[in-house]
Amino acid sequence: MIVRKSMGRVKSLLMLLMVLGFSFATYNLVFMMMEHKAGNDLGSFDGKAMEIRNTNSKYHVAVTATDAAYSQWQCRIMYYWYKKTKDMPGSAMGKFTRILHSGRGDQLMNEIPTFVVDPLPEGLDRGYIVLNRPWAFVQWLEKAVIDEEYILMAEPDHIFVNPLPNLATENEPAGYPFFYIKPAENEKIMRKFYPKENGPVTDVDPIGNSPVIIHKYMLEEIAPTWVNISLRMKDDPETDKAFGWVLEMYAYAVASALHGIKHILRKDFMLQPPWDLDVGKKFIIHFTYGCDYNLKGKLTYGKIGEWRFDKRSYLMGPPPKNLSLPPPGVPESVVRLVKMVNEATANIPNWDSLNRS
């Protein structure tokens, strides 16, 4: 056992052990309940489920983050655009929380509403820092006061480009279908975590945890299982090799399926430049991919372009103000992204100095 000086860390570790113990018990319970599956699905929420309906209920925007400069500058841009779109017609945004899983506060505490939680015990993430995300949500849900009944799980590299309504219902969360999350094509691996007795692997949605809008009670049920499945997947060499950097996304999808939850799949939830060319009526720009073009506006993906925007170019500090716009011929989605970054950096105080490692 790792000895911690902070009693808060000790309590956090004890809570993790309790979560894992509960999750293992929950997972094993699946096998015991298969004979009664028709009326007793694990976590099917039959007692809480209400008539499916569109809702105008507000959702709480929650983004998990670290205190690294790379995470900080993205969070600052995201929060800027949250504030600009929050009260626009059509938006159902409530309050905002940056869930900081570094175990300590940072210099953005007074700028962005922040809730500090502990990281996983040292070494447990095995260098895969995203494993801290489900554990961060477990702690936040357990300890924080959350006024809204729904939660949007978001990421630092999300920019709100249009007012986002509540896309979920009481018993159906809303998620984005990722083309690279393919449960059916990985059935052998999936069966380690989603047994045949549970049903076909197509029950597992092709999603990650973000972006997802979900009712709070559902996330409270899913989150401990999500922690457990994430750690079990990381501990399995075959799964770790096959899923790589999207392992935690698969873990959320499996955890949801184990609880009998299907998501409304919304392709308009998000766009991802440079592959998505137009913004249209989509709601979030996800700038996870590098955008590389020659001066004729031709995409040179996989090769550094004469013009480029890639968030990984700014690992140690923020991008400069007034980035050059893409050359003519570059898709509108990329142009819009750079313009939105430029607007944010021009208006956020102390942009060049506050968030540097």
UniProtKB/Swiss-Prot annotation:
Molecular function per GO: hydroxyproline O-arabinosyltransferase activity
InterPro entries per the UniProt record, alphabetical: HPAT-like, HPAT/SRGT1-like
GO (cellular component) term, any one: Golgi membrane
Topological relation to the membrane, as annotated: Single-pass type II membrane protein
Main location: Golgi
Subcellular localization, as worded in the UniProt entry: Golgi apparatus membrane
Record has Transmembrane as a keyword: yes
Domain of life: Eukaryota
This protein's name: Hydroxyproline O-arabinosyltransferase RDN1
Organism: Medicago truncatula (Barrel medic)
High-level lineage: Eukaryota, Viridiplantae, Streptophyta, Embryophyta, Tracheophyta
UniProt gene name: RDN1
